[in-house]
A protein has these predicted regions:
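Bacterial N-terminal signal peptides that target proteins for export
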Residues: 1-7
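General helical structural elements
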Residues: 7-8, 22
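Bacterial N-terminal signal peptides
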Residues: 8-15
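A generic, residue-level signal for flexible/boundary positions that often mark functional hotspots
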Residues: 15-16, 51
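Sec/Tat signal peptide C-region and signal peptidase I cleavage site
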Residues: 16-22
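Contiguous segments within soluble domain cores/interaction surfaces
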Residues: 22-129
C-alpha cells in the first residue's frame, strides 16, 4: 500500500516538473484569422495559449514584432506594426499595411508572467484581394 502511494506521489511530481520545465515551449501563438484582405490599416490578430491547459494568456507583454513576406521569398518586403486593443482574452492585435497579396510572416516575442524565457512564435497570414 505504501509503495502504491509513493509511486502515485512520484508520478504527480514528474507531471508537475514537466509542466514547470515546459517554460516558453509551453505556449503557442495561433492566428485568429489566417486569411486577411490586402491593403492599408489591416488588422492581424494572434491568440496566445498555454498548451497544457488550452487557456488564453491575458497578461503577456509583447516585446518584439515583425511582419514580412519571407514565406514568399521576399523577406525584405516588411511593414510596420502598431498594437491595437483587443476585447478578446489572450488576443493580441496589430494594425499594418499588407501591400501585396501573398503570405506574410508575423514574428512575435512575448514575456509571460512567471516564465524566465521569452515566448516566441511565427504565424503565417495570407493576404488576398
Amino acid at each position: 500500500m505504501i509503495r502504491k502511494i509513493l509511486l502515485a506521489g512520484v508520478a504527480i511530481a514528474i507531471a508537475v516538473a514537466r509542466t514547470a520545465l515546459a517554460g516558453a515551449n509551453g505556449y503557442v501563438f495561433e492566428p485568429v484569422k489566417a486569411e486577411v484582405k490586402k491593403g492599408d490599416d489591416v488588422i492581424v490578430s494572434v491568440r496566445l495559449k498555454h498548451k497544457a491547459t488550452g487557456k488564453p494568456v491575458t497578461d503577456a507583454v509583447i516585446v518584439q514584432t515583425r511582419i514580412d513576406m519571407s514565406p514568399d521569398a521576399m523577406g525584405e518586403m516588411a511593414s510596420p506594426l502598431t498594437p491595437v486593443p483587443s476585447n478578446e482574452p489572450g488576443v493580441y492585435s496589430f494594425k499594418t499595411d499588407l501591400s501585396m497579396q501573398g503570405r506574410w510572416l508575423l514574428s512575435i516575442a512575448a514575456k509571460v508572467q512567471g516564465e524566465p524565457d521569452t515566448v516566441v512564435g511565427e504565424i503565417t497570414f495570407r493576404a488576398t484581394r
